[in-house]
Amino acid sequence: MELRISERKQAKIRIAMQGSAGSGKTYSSLLLAKGLTGGDYSKIAIIDTEHRSADLYAHLGKYNVVSMEAPFSPERYIEAIELCEKAGMDVIILDSISHCWDYLLDVHANMQGNSFIAWSKITPRQNKFVHKILNSSAHIIATMRVKQDYVLSQKNGKMIPEKVGLKAIQRNDLDFEFTIVFDIDQAHKAKVTKDRTGLFVSMPQFLIGPTTGIKIREWCCQNIRERRKEISIEIAKCTSLEALRHVYSKYPLLQKELKPIILEKKRELEKMYSQEIPNLNLIEQSKARQNGIDSNQ
């Protein structure tokens, strides 16, 4: 357990793309991911549950694809995410996570006995999946299909269903787990329904593109740049190898980036020590002669 100052670098972005079939969720996700990776498609992976639809956009770049077939269990999604993480992916697109919810609903429908007891067995599986999304080492973009939502209203003494818009096919409160939620219409335009970054709150509907991902990446990296400057100054002030080791161990998440600066400072300190040691030997020899001791005699 550790108390630390809040830093954006500690959290990867979690984005949800909601829309009906044909709205362009996969295409929009790929363009956004391009911006997040600085144009490097090789650092993007799609976990494809939509009958290999991810391959339709291969002309965009050489991104990676994990094709998933039924059953779409939470455990298989977790396994696919871990596969992408081990391969060093920066962005993982889950296309789509609605299949996971459909799978759990089917499992629940086929369970015998009390419905609440059945959900007590299913909910932990869903929670593990959500936990994996939130704690992944990569940026996550999750697409979700939507369906018409209804409410029952009383009219003339009768309960009549009324349309109240579209609803994502997933657990009701799942959108709370994401940093940004985009609703995409049939014209492929996005509207933000949740935005904890504040980047898109006041924007009208727009087409998602690489610049969208660039904005989000800049927001994520803003604090990192400031932190790097502070650490570089801290390294420059080190006067011993022990102090340098201490600085290096303080920032485990940045060690890969800090290594070249640390090694350069290490060489500088070692050179300084090598110059000091001969001078120290001369001083010791002078003292020995004054005491009537000469090592050359």
Question: Where in this protein do the model-derived segments appear?
Answer:
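Interfaces that engage single-stranded nucleic acids at replication/repair/recombination sites
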Residues: 1-19, 23, 34, 51-56, ...
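Conserved P-loop NTPase nucleotide-binding/switch module
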Residues: 94-124, 152, 159
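Intein modules and their embedded homing endonuclease domains
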Residues: 15, 36, 43, 54, ...
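Hydrophobic positions on the alpha1 helix immediately C-terminal to the Walker A/P-loop
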Residues: 28
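Nucleotide-state-sensitive switch-loop elements of NTP-binding domains
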Residues: 39-90
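Residue-level preference for the first positions of well-ordered beta-strands
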Residues: 14-16, 43, 90-93, 139-141
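Walker A/P-loop NTP-binding motif
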Residues: 31-38
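Phosphate-binding/switch region of NTP-binding enzymes
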Residues: 20, 131-214
